[in-house]
């Protein structure tokens, strides 16, 4: 069985590289984002999907509904696929958060945030893992960080440690993965996170407190 995972369609926030990790902020798709969803019919086997899953964010759910072409009463909402909580950086440029992350490390929670970058990645991976129990083939509509991590894992050189920053994942570019392969990726990534978390805080850039 196969899982198709993609980042939501383009938004005004994404074109300006602004961060939104608060699902109560109504960030919707831009006009181009809506058009891109219509074009996605040519690259996704939408007719064969049995389960549709979206994060708890409006832009992810809007993307899923546009891809179905009809109101999807059976759309599954999986909050563990949500975007990272950026805390006080909410609504600001990614560069501001990125500079803070570079200085403070992947395990430190930004002021006002409920999770660190690594804690957020773990949450997202557990969300994907849970979705593998749903009837397949399935489509998961999530956010950039999760897709960036999975694309990195797909092309990961042997022995390479998880980086602090990942290449940006394009909107609506699907990652199509056999369930057995995806399950192996998740297990490897969770193991990496466990190994990082067990290190001395000084060696991993400050533990979340």
Identify what each model region corresponds to.
Residues 2-70, 100:
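Active-site-proximal alpha-helix that buttresses catalytic centers in soluble enzyme cores
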Residues 11, 146-147:
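Short active-site segment of divalent metal-dependent hydrolases/proteases
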Residues 27-28, 67-123, 165:
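Phosphate-handling substructures
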Residues 45-48, 131-136:
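Glycine-rich phosphate-binding loop signature in dinucleotide/nucleotide-binding domains
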Residues 54-55, 122, 141-142:
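Short beta-strand scaffold positions
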Residues 77, 83-95, 151-209:
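Acidic, low-complexity terminal tails and accessory targeting/binding regions
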Residues 120-134:
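A short, acidic, amphipathic alpha-helical segment used as a generic capping/interface helix at domain edges
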């Amino acid at each position: 069985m196969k899982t198709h995972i993609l980042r939501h369609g383009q938004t005004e926030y994404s074109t300006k590289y602004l961060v939104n990790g608060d699902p109560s902020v109504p960030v919707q798709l831009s006009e181009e984002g809506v058009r891109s969803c219509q074009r996605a019919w040519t690259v996704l086997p939408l007719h064969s999907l049995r389960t549709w899953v979206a994060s708890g964010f409006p832009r992810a759910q809007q993307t899923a509904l546009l891809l179905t072409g009809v109101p999807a009463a059976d759309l599954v909402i999986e909050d563990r696929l949500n975007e990272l909580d950026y805390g006080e950086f909410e609504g600001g440029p990614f560069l501001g958060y990125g500079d803070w992350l570079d200085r403070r490390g992947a395990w430190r929670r930004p002021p006002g945030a409920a999770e660190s970058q690594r804690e957020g990645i773990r949450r997202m991976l557990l969300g994907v893992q849970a979705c593998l129990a749903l009837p397949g083939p399935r489509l998961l509509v999530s956010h950039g960080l999760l897709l960036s991590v999975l694309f990195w894992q797909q092309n990961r050189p042997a022995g390479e440690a998880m980086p602090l920053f990942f290449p940006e994942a394009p909107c609506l570019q699907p990652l199509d993965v056999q369930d057995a392969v995806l399950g192996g990726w998740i297990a490897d990534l969770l193991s990496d996170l466990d190994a990082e978390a067990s290190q001395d805080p000084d060696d991993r850039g400050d533990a979340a407190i």
